[in-house]
Amino acid sequence: MVVGSSTRRWDVRRRAKHARLEGTRKALGLSGKVIPTNKIGMAIDTLVMPGDRVVLEGNNQKQADFLSRALVNVDSERIHDLHMIMPSVSLPEHMDLFEKGIAKRLDFSYAGSQSLRIAQLLEDGQLEIGAIHTYVELYSRLYVDLIPNVVLVAAYAADREGNLYTGPSTEDTPALLEAAAFHDGVVIAQVNEIVDDPKDLKRVDIPGSWVDYVVKADRPFFIEPLFTRDPRQIKDAHILMAMMALKGIYAPHEVESLNHGIGFNTAAVELLLPTFGEELGIKGKVCRHWCLNPHPTLIPAIESGWVKSVHCFGGELGMEDYIAARPDVFFTGPDGSMRSNRAFCQMAGQYAVDMFVGSTLQMDPLGNSSTVTRVRLAGFGGAPNMGHDPHGRRHPTKAWLEMIPKPDPVARGKKLVVQMVETFQAGPKPTFVETLDAVPVAQKAGLPLAPVMIYGDDVTHVVTEEGIACLYRAESLEERKALVASVAGITDIGMAADPAVVKKLRFEKKLLRPEDLEINPAKANRSLLAAKSIADLVEWSGGLYNPPAKFRSW
């Protein structure tokens, strides 16, 4: 019996990594971990090989933009067919990699501003998509079948031994970096500052033994204030839906732990807590524990004593001083700055919260939703992760247990998954459609599955300006379709609703109109908002919130 092999090498990846590092050391004349700023191009040339799996940190907010500019300037004759793995595809140079033939395949979670270009490159055959993931799913695959050869990340500061301070914008960095650091991949970090004395780092978020090289970028890394919503853009329709949600969902189920999406609907909810929420008498019963980026619109609720804790996926530009001054609420280090962590916060949002509230671009008659349209391949970010019912959950809460429709000793509770949408998008484009655009997009792109963001069987409530459809109480697929149609307004789906069925659903309280909740739509206006402008949010914060220039009107 052959017990082992005397000829097979078991350290191929390690030897390959050492060869790359040695090649870089000789080519650049390095004696340590610091790459001179003006030699980053040479470093990339020696560290990245054709066909490599390359993780490029694109996050929701933080971007390794200096490294992406260096990568896009390589010779495509020498470096090509890269398999890019990016949580967030956010910068033009991310797509330039594919146009120039440097990269070929993409696995990602969210695209945002590059969604139109991804769709075009896909159609032109210049880009292949592996899959559109939720964040945790993508991180997880880095440890299974997408193990990276090279990881390019961003941090605020480093010392000469490679210790990194990632601070408020830690975001995805630990999850991305560890996959390479412990399986013989190369790790390069761009930083805003390199200090000589390790004691000059505010704290160490990533140990230097995980990092192969650091380079001072030509300018501070780009960060997008993605989760800042100007209260001036909140419309009466948003306020009406927020009032219905608070009275018809949050209050009766006593939802204490939750995640909000980034739309104006949820911003309205946050700004109604100190006003309409106080009127309802639900302070201390709802909205106490959050998995949330540090939304400026949550400031009035925090200052009013509604919020006990907030764990954050990432930072938010301008919120740094406010967060540092509220350590009882936010997770902060001994230096005072916040420690975000998207991987941990996504897990918390999956298993530890009772409710997810978000929006979508399209919803079909069964409640399936997607943000992928015929012209935009936006991806989903964390919505599929937080917007589904995790069957592995075992700890009970009132809200979770109340989603059990009928008593059963072995029944499982359910997370509340709420879709808050207007019946029409800007355009006007109907939100409710017979078939999601995701279906033909998948067929055209050769994807084996339509990129559905949230499946209808996970959705417990749909909220529109027409009312609340309590899908968790549907006793059949036909009844679920009837409930969706009952709140679809004057879309084709809504116009096909049977008035007799709608009347029955209202009688059974499976459908709640504003009047059923004793809410007068005429009173749903901006006077109810605790803050009506960015300037009001600054005032609520006691001057600690420092909004980015584009949000200032003074």
Label every PLM stretch briefly.
Residues V2-W554:
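Conserved alpha/beta enzyme-core scaffold
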